[in-house]
């Protein structure tokens, strides 16, 4: 069937209006190709009288009225499957790593329905991360959704990289990394890190374990809006082959922000704080597809930027509803020099249930949170009256809480190059044992400095000996 042709009638920035014959109008989300150019337009609105409003997925420089546009009749399709492994692609699935074309034998549209309810497969299996505070307070479920929330510069990307280091490298399945509106430098660093670790196999790309899709900060809003869907489509294809997939998104907030830009360009009335009126629906459309079926699983880890450290902002607040575990990074904890700067009182997980994690893990986690909460309440009294005015049991609580706080810190493998301290992976059993000993008072004789930036509790005892020497 010959492709229907239309012509550009208006071009305002990234928004392009195209006129088609009235009896052959394209559908919403159809991809249109500009004749003689690589530019793709995606239909967003039908304006009537044969005119459709589209968003340019690429620079609209040089476009003018009267240029001919062809309707492909389908949504944007991207390559999926083995051909994408070890490659860096853009929103349209074109390679940007200068290593030749990506094999297009298998392709899939980026818009599709979420799996039906009866196809879903809830999982109670835990995913060990090797990061103490996460494994103890907000354990991850295999096939679950995790959000890393934090303001600017508190360590979302470093935490994300450490999770990739600890899970993806030791994980038998495949990973997909979607860089949505983040720094190009970070995308480049990630690629080289994956190459050094052998996750990207330079000799035989098809034996790699990760596919990368980037639509970074410098891209037009259309690219940043759709790049998360492109990455998700690739992850879904691996899942439907029966694989266990890790899907990393950095950063989901930029997806919302791109939606805001597009919404404003399309002339929609903004809602709260200037966000698009369709914020919840757009977020739901993406998040409902990130799910595990009876065939395979997608475990997703998403970094979520929190504007002005305000968790009640509509964008992070909308994201909260879709997640199984939330890891909240706090500027106050970062300012104490405790990294990862995870707030153990704000972070939550559906998996932290005695029937899932076991009675011992649950009790230790709740005791740790209880001790820290009591310390938080006592801090005002300490600030006004000093430590000496506290009751003996409160003094003990404060001492233990400060040790717990420091023991929640941990040297990261990915930060080794900056700190010089070798990274530590701590198993869940060791994590529980360590915190149980602190809560039980078996470490009351150790100085609190011995707990700072160590792995297991045994290392804290070793460090205490060195400090005493």
Curated annotation (Swiss-Prot):
User: How is this protein positioned relative to the membrane?
Assistant: Peripheral membrane protein
- Subcellular location, principal: membrane
UniProt key word Protease: no
Q: Which keywords accompany this UniProt record?
A: ATP synthesis, ATP-binding, Cell inner membrane, Cell membrane, CF(1), Hydrogen ion transport, Ion transport, Membrane, Nucleotide-binding, Translocase, Transport
Quote the PROSITE patterns the UniProt record gives.
ATPASE_ALPHA_BETA
Positions of ATP binding: 150-157
Q: What is its EC number?
A: 7.1.2.2
Establish whether keyword Cell membrane is in the entry.
Answer: yes
This protein's GO CC annotations: plasma membrane; proton-transporting ATP synthase complex
Could you say which enzyme class this protein belongs to?
translocase
* An MF annotation (GO) of this entry: ATP binding
The record ties this protein, via Pfam families, to: ATP-synt_ab (PF00006), ATP-synt_ab_N (PF02874), ATP-synt_VA_C (PF22919)
Kindly list the places in or outside the cell where this protein is found, as annotated in its UniProt entry: Cell inner membrane
* Superkingdom of origin: Bacteria
Q: Which reaction does it catalyse?
A: ATP + H2O + 4 H(+)(in) = ADP + phosphate + 5 H(+)(out)
Q: What does this protein do?
A: Produces ATP from ADP in the presence of a proton gradient across the membrane. The catalytic sites are hosted primarily by the beta subunits.
Tell me the protein family, please.
Belongs to the ATPase alpha/beta chains family.
Oligomer and partners: F-type ATPases have 2 components, CF(1) - the catalytic core - and CF(0) - the membrane proton channel. CF(1) has five subunits: alpha(3), beta(3), gamma(1), delta(1), epsilon(1). CF(0) has three main subunits: a(1), b(2) and c(9-12). The alpha and beta chains form an alternating ring which encloses part of the gamma chain. CF(1) is attached to CF(0) by a central stalk formed by the gamma and epsilon chains, while a peripheral stalk is formed by the delta and b chains.
Q: Which HAMAP family match?
A: ATP_synth_beta_bact
In its UniProt entry, what is this protein called? ATP synthase subunit beta
UniProt source species: Delftia acidovorans (strain DSM 14801 / SPH-1)
């Amino acid at each position: 069937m010959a492709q229907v042709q239309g012509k550009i009638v208006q071009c305002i920035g990234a928004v392009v209006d195209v006129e088609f014959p009235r009896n052959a109008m394209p559908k919403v989300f159809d991809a249109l190709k500009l004749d003689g150019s690589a530019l793709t337009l995606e239909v967003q609105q039908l304006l009537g009288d044969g005119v459709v409003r589209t968003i340019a997925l690429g620079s609209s420089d040089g476009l003018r009225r009267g240029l001919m546009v062809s309707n492909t009749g389908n949504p944007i399709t991207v390559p999926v499957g083995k051909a994408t492994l070890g490659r860096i692609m853009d929103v349209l699935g074109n390679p940007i790593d200068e290593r030749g074309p990506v094999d297009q034998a298998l392709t899939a549209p980026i818009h599709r329905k979420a799996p039906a309810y009866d196809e879903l497969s809830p999982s109670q299996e835990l995913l060990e991360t090797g990061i103490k505070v996460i494994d103890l307070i907000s354990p991850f479920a295999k096939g679950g959704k995790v959000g890393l929330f934090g303001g600017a510069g508190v360590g979302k990307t470093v935490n994300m990289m450490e999770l990739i280091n600890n899970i993806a490298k030791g994980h038998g399945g495949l990973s997909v990394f979607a860089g949505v509106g983040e720094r190009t430098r970070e995308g480049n660093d990630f690629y080289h890190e994956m190459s050094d670790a052998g996750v990207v196999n330079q000799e035989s790309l098809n034996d790699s374990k990760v596919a990368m899709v980037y639509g970074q900060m410098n891209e037009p809003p259309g690219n940043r809006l759709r790049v998360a869907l492109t990455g998700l489509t690739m992850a879904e294809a691996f899942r439907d082959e029966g694989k266990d997939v890790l899907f990393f998104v950095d950063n989901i907030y930029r997806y919302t922000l791109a939606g805001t830009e597009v919404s404003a360009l399309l002339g929609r009335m903004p809602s709260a704080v200037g966000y698009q009126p369709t914020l919840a629906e757009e977020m739901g459309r993406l998040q409902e597809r990130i799910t595990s079926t009876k065939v395979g699983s997608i475990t997703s880890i998403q970094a979520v930027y929190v504007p002005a450290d305000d968790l009640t902002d509509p964008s992070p607040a909308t994201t909260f509803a879709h997640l199984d575990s939330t890891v909240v990074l706090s500027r106050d904890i970062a300012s104490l020099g405790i990294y990862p700067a995870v707030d153990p009182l704000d972070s939550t997980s559906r998996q932290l249930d005695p029937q899932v994690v076991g009675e011992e893990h649950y009790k230790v986690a709740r005791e740790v949170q209880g001790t820290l909460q009591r310390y938080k309440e006592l801090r005002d009294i300490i600030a006004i009256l000093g430590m000496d005015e506290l009751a003996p049991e409160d003094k003990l609580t404060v001492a233990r809480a400060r040790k717990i706080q420091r023991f929640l810190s941990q040297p990261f493998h990915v930060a080794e190059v900056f700190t010089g301290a070798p990274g530590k992976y701590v198993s869940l059993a060791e994590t529980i044992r360590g915190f149980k000993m602190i809560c039980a008072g078996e470490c009351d004789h150790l100085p609190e400095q011995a707990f700072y930036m160590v792995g297991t509790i045994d290392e804290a005892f070793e460090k205490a000996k060195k400090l005493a020497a």
